[in-house]
């Protein structure tokens, strides 16, 4: 019989145990927990990513892996910020043993809080809006709607291109790891799903837990392939417009054409694996 006990997250690192207001748990994954907290001032929101220790691993190996992974993520973010790519800025980080903290056994990374809506939600809301209203839209209105989403797709391509130009591979490119940051706070999206969402603003890449540094076309192509598959499984209505993502990507840096050529090979391998099962 399944347990009905509420989930209890692991203890917070000591710097955050008495924070006011307390950190708010947003998501929990196999490797990390994401909280919303504040940095230095109650009016300055921040994202806190906590990597708890893994009791099933040898303690020495666990500490080494946790430290390596949090540092790898932070280094990628710092490099991208320096290159002008839209990603959260690193505010602070620590791991067990660095500050003498005992009992926590993990690592944490505090980052700039990115206001906005996840691109997955934006596209899902737009698809629902179009499904409900398509019959009532005239040809001109339909073209305007499609032009809006094409522009967003191209901006996604520009964002991924800027990432790869800087020599960083995301490792988990999905629309859940892209945030559409509105130009002003006044343009925050309403909560109702019935609305037609705004698509204005910058595309910000988040969640670099699987990121690495590489200039290899193969790695770039796999990154793009993961994003393409994400569109196919999550956004069937906008999947045919994925060519706009690739168009924006091609415009973003000189070596993009080589990565796109390699993408064709990655697609072929993916199709063969699907056929074999």
Curated annotation (Swiss-Prot):
<keyword id="KW-0378">Hydrolase</keyword>
<keyword id="KW-0779">Telomere</keyword>
<dbReference type="InterPro" id="IPR000719">
    <property type="entry name" value="Prot_kinase_dom"/>
</dbReference>
<keyword id="KW-0067">ATP-binding</keyword>
<dbReference type="GO" id="GO:0070525">
    <property type="term" value="P:tRNA threonylcarbamoyladenosine metabolic process"/>
</dbReference>
<keyword id="KW-0805">Transcription regulation</keyword>
<feature type="active site" description="Proton acceptor">
    <location>
        <position position="172"/>
    </location>
</feature>
<dbReference type="GO" id="GO:0000408">
    <property type="term" value="C:EKC/KEOPS complex"/>
</dbReference>
<dbReference type="GO" id="GO:0106310">
    <property type="term" value="F:protein serine kinase activity"/>
</dbReference>
<comment type="similarity">
    <text>Belongs to the protein kinase superfamily. BUD32 family.</text>
</comment>
<dbReference type="GO" id="GO:0016787">
    <property type="term" value="F:hydrolase activity"/>
</dbReference>
<keyword id="KW-0804">Transcription</keyword>
<dbReference type="GO" id="GO:0005829">
    <property type="term" value="C:cytosol"/>
</dbReference>
<protein>
    <recommendedName>
        <fullName>EKC/KEOPS complex subunit bud32</fullName>
        <ecNumber>3.6.-.-</ecNumber>
        <ecNumber>2.7.11.1</ecNumber>
    </recommendedName>
</protein>
<dbReference type="GO" id="GO:0004674">
    <property type="term" value="F:protein serine/threonine kinase activity"/>
</dbReference>
<feature type="binding site">
    <location>
        <position position="49"/>
    </location>
    <ligand>
        <name>ATP</name>
    </ligand>
</feature>
<feature type="region of interest" description="Disordered">
    <location>
        <begin position="1"/>
        <end position="24"/>
    </location>
</feature>
<keyword id="KW-0723">Serine/threonine-protein kinase</keyword>
<feature type="domain" description="Protein kinase">
    <location>
        <begin position="20"/>
        <end position="277"/>
    </location>
</feature>
<feature type="compositionally biased region" description="Pro residues">
    <location>
        <begin position="7"/>
        <end position="24"/>
    </location>
</feature>
<keyword id="KW-0819">tRNA processing</keyword>
<dbReference type="InterPro" id="IPR022495">
    <property type="entry name" value="Bud32"/>
</dbReference>
<keyword id="KW-0547">Nucleotide-binding</keyword>
<comment type="subunit">
    <text>Component of the EKC/KEOPS complex composed of at least bud32, cgi121, gon7, kae1 and pcc1; the whole complex dimerizes.</text>
</comment>
<keyword id="KW-0010">Activator</keyword>
<dbReference type="InterPro" id="IPR011009">
    <property type="entry name" value="Kinase-like_dom_sf"/>
</dbReference>
<dbReference type="GO" id="GO:0005524">
    <property type="term" value="F:ATP binding"/>
</dbReference>
<keyword id="KW-0963">Cytoplasm</keyword>
<keyword id="KW-0418">Kinase</keyword>
<keyword id="KW-0539">Nucleus</keyword>
<dbReference type="InterPro" id="IPR008266">
    <property type="entry name" value="Tyr_kinase_AS"/>
</dbReference>
<dbReference type="Pfam" id="PF06293">
    <property type="entry name" value="Kdo"/>
</dbReference>
<dbReference type="GO" id="GO:0005634">
    <property type="term" value="C:nucleus"/>
</dbReference>
<keyword id="KW-0808">Transferase</keyword>
<dbReference type="GO" id="GO:0000781">
    <property type="term" value="C:chromosome, telomeric region"/>
</dbReference>
<comment type="function">
    <text>Component of the EKC/KEOPS complex that is required for the formation of a threonylcarbamoyl group on adenosine at position 37 (t(6)A37) in tRNAs that read codons beginning with adenine. The complex is probably involved in the transfer of the threonylcarbamoyl moiety of threonylcarbamoyl-AMP (TC-AMP) to the N6 group of A37. BUD32 has ATPase activity in the context of the EKC/KEOPS complex and likely plays a supporting role to the catalytic subunit KAE1. The EKC/KEOPS complex also promotes both telomere uncapping and telomere elongation.</text>
</comment>
<keyword id="KW-0597">Phosphoprotein</keyword>
<dbReference type="GO" id="GO:0008033">
    <property type="term" value="P:tRNA processing"/>
</dbReference>
<feature type="binding site">
    <location>
        <begin position="26"/>
        <end position="34"/>
    </location>
    <ligand>
        <name>ATP</name>
    </ligand>
</feature>
<keyword id="KW-0158">Chromosome</keyword>
């Amino acid at each position: 019989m399944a347990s009905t006990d509420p989930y209890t997250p692991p203890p917070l690192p000591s710097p955050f145990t008495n924070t006011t207001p307390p950190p708010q748990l947003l998501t929990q994954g196999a490797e990390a927990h994401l909280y919303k907290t504040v940095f230095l001032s109650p009016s300055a929101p921040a994202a806190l990513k906590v990597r708890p220790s893994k009791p099933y691993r040898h303690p020495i190996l666990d500490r080494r892996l946790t430290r390596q992974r949090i540092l790898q993520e932070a280094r990628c973010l710092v490099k991208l910020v320096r290159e002008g790519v839209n990603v959260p800025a690193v505010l602070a980080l620590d791991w067990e043993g660095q500050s003498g903290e005992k009992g926590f056994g993990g690592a944490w990374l505090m980052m700039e809080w990115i206001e906005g809506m996840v691109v997955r939600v934006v596209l899902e809301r737009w698809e629902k809006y179009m499904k409900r209203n398509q019959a009532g839209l005239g040809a001109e209105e339909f073209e305007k709607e499609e032009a809006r989403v094409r522009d967003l797709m191209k901006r996604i391509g520009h964002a991924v291109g800027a990432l790869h130009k800087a020599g960083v591979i995301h490792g988990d490119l999905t629309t859940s790891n892209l945030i559409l940051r509105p130009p002003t706070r006044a343009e925050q999206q309403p909560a109702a799903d019935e609305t037609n969402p705004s698509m204005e603003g910058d595309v910000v890449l988040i969640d670099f837990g699987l990121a690495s540094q590489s200039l290899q076309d193969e790695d770039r192509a796999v990154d793009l392939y993961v994003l393409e598959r994400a569109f196919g499984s999550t956004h069937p209505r906008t999947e045919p417009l994925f060519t706009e993502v690739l168009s924006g990507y091609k415009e973003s840096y000189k070596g993009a054409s080589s990565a796109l050529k390699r993408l064709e090979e990655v697609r072929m391998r993916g199709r063969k694996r699907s056929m074999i099962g």
